[in-house]
Amino acid sequence: MDKNELRHSIFATAKREGSLKESVIKHAGDYGINDVEELLPQAKQLTPEFVNSDVEWVDKVLQKVHKSPFARVKTLFLDITAETLRAKGYIKGTEKVEHVFELIKRNTEPTTIYTKQKIDRDDVIDVTDFPLVSWIKQEMELKLNEELARAILLGDGRVPGDPYKIDEECIRPIVKDDDLYSVKVELPADFMANQDYTQFIKTVARNRKKYKGSGSPALFASEDTIAELLLIEDSTGRLIYPTVEALKSALRVSDIIAVPELEGFVRETKDGKVHTVLGIIANLADYSLGADKGGEKALFDDFDIDFNQMKYLLETRRSGALVKPYSALIIENVE
């Protein structure tokens, strides 16, 4: 076979096989090179990517919360909303009456959250295509941050009694907090049946006056909820909120943050009712995340000489709670 015939044959085979490399290998024997694949460059190992749910919300949560240099948080309030506390008119000769107010307080103690990893030292030495140890540390920090952010908004989702559950008396989930801090706002009873998201907009608008937090809050919701709100149409089929900015304006919020963990999130109350949470409206500046000196994230590493393993521990000791009354609105459907 001459060179021209060989060249045409190689390219014809490449069209059928879909790969010039495979075609060259098939015709290698025609020009005296066997095992030509051994001469081809080897595949280059790239640094592995993490397969994980969307975690953009995690950074936003941890950036927005108030960082306190103290792990133990004590909140103290005087409830002066009672009718009996109003200033009174006086008629000469009558007795003046003192008013009595209620003192409300709570303490939040710190708890430890950690993630731990180990790897054989032989593997650390043998893996040369990317920095294995740095990659493991990156994964550990990613998962610790994600767990902390989840605990702040929703709780970690583990059942009571689970040995790994994050103590909800130490990191208080906004969605489950006392009504003094998180105001529960119920959607109309037929909301889930009708899937009419205009009711969501109206319910938020009518209950916005109950929000007493700092500044302009943000809405935390699932991607599906945000999509349904953006797809609300008028009677002519035109989108009422064609952009996120228009939706933010209608809801009177400064930001809309998608939280995958809110998809289908429910909480059960002592009366047996199921509350499906559709959204959380809060300014996380009103959530205090406290840590004493040394309680911030700390990484420890050790070497186990018996098993030839490198071990890593990343942990933080924190407390967390809303510190301002009525600083969150929980938009939910009750069944």
Model regions and ranges:
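Short helix/loop capping segments that flank catalytic or ligand/cofactor-binding pockets
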Residues: K60, L85-G89, H99, D126-T128, ...
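Extended oligomerization regions of viral-like shell subunits
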Residues: R158-I305, M310, L314-T316, E335
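Assembly/oligomerization interface modules of large self-assembling protein complexes
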Residues: R16-K116
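Alpha-helical scaffold segments that mediate packing/assembly in large oligomeric complexes
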Residues: K96, K105-P110, Y114-T203, I330-E335
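Intrinsically disordered, low-complexity, charge-biased terminal/linker regions in eukaryotic proteins
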Residues: M1-S19
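Structural signal for terminal/edge beta-strands and the immediately following C-terminal loop/tail
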Residues: S319-E335
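Beta-strand elements of well-folded, non-transmembrane domains
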Residues: R121, T316-G320
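Generic recognition of stable, solvent-exposed alpha-helical segments in well-folded globular domains
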Residues: E38-Q45, S53-W57, P131, W135, ...
